[in-house]
């Protein structure tokens, strides 16, 4: 079996560093297991229905913590780690796109507008 290409974002490392040591160890174990076989049933690679971006999934670290992953072609990018609900809330606000000019993956917050944007009363000059 080929090893999956797994990348780790700086935000993932920062989020992991803020978790208890015991959880950090579990994250390391999971990353190694994920690299060897991302389709392993023990990883619980699952779609997050609340996400705007359908390429974002969760992986189970333990009963309490989840990792957030985006799959772009044959590369998995680990984005975030947090308590289950907080991780899902974080993921629901994100979108990932490949920059057409640089080829790099960009992760950004999605904002929703609660009111329609008013039409301009005067025509625009340009």
Please report, for each region that a protein language model flagged, where it lies by residue.
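A short, surface-exposed loop/turn module that caps and links secondary-structure elements
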Residues: 32-59
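Surface-exposed alpha-helical segments enriched in charged/polar residues
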Residues: 14-17, 32
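Enriched for short, Lys/Arg-rich terminal
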Residues: 1-3, 57, 61-126
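N-terminal "first-domain core" detector
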Residues: 2-15, 26, 45
């Amino acid at each position: 079996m080929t090893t999956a290409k797994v990348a780790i974002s700086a935000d993932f490392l920062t989020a992991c560093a803020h978790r208890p040591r015991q959880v950090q160890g579990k994250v390391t174990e999971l990353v190694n297991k994920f690299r060897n076989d991302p389709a392993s049933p023990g990883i619980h690679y699952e779609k997050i229905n609340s996400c705007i971006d359908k390429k974002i999934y969760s992986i189970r670290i333990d009963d309490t913590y989840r990792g957030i992953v985006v799959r772009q072609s044959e590369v998995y990018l680990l984005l975030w780690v947090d308590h289950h609900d907080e991780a899902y809330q974080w993921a629901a606000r994100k979108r990932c796109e490949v920059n057409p000019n640089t080829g790099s993956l960009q992760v950004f917050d999605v904002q929703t507008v609660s009111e329609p944007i008013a039409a301009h009363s005067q025509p625009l000059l340009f």
